[in-house]
A protein has these predicted regions:
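Feature detects amphipathic, helix-rich regulatory segments
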Residues: 1-153
Length: 153
């Protein structure tokens, strides 16, 4: 059983410190394959999406996107987290209030996303992953960052 979170994307539901409220009948649950993008249609505008590092199942409330040729799935996973994309997702979501906003796939498909060629997508993803790794490392070891006062003129 997998879950989609805002901060961590697709994770094993067992890794979350939540009560399992899933149905005992999983026949309507959706299959996710490693490399698919899964998103929570009611929270896409908040960034509840991610590339799945696992194969498994998710709640029927989630939407699964299977990548096609010439698409680097992680490129779009990063793009889906950008503020400009979140704004578009909010704009295209349907519902009266933020509690009921919903972005189903037919509407998501209408949103224009710009993507360079596949090689550029790969380069961009590599750079962003290195930045993520550096940021995570610095957050784990804040003592490595020292603020030095500016020398007097």
């Amino acid at each position: 059983m997998l879950s989609v979170t805002i901060n961590d994307g697709v994770v094993k539901a067992s890794s979350l410190k939540r009560k399992d409220n899933s149905s005992s009948d999983k026949s309507n649950y959706k299959l996710v394959r490693k490399g698919d993008i899964a998103y929570n249609s009611m929270r896409m505008w908040q960034g509840a999406s991610g590339t799945s590092p696992y194969s498994g199942i998710v709640s029927p409330a989630y939407t699964i996107i299977t990548p096609i040729n010439n698409i680097v799935v992680d490129f779009f996973a990063y793009q889906f987290k950008m503020k400009s994309s979140l704004y578009k997702f909010q704009k295209y979501s349907q519902g009266l209030t933020s509690d009921t906003w919903n972005l189903k796939f037919p509407l998501l498909r209408e949103i224009k996303m710009i993507a360079p060629n596949k090689n550029e997508q790969i380069k961009i993803v590599c750079l962003l992953k290195k930045l993520d790794s550096t940021i995570a490392s610095n957050q784990r070891h804040p003592f490595l960052l020292k603020i030095r006062p500016r020398p007097p003129p």
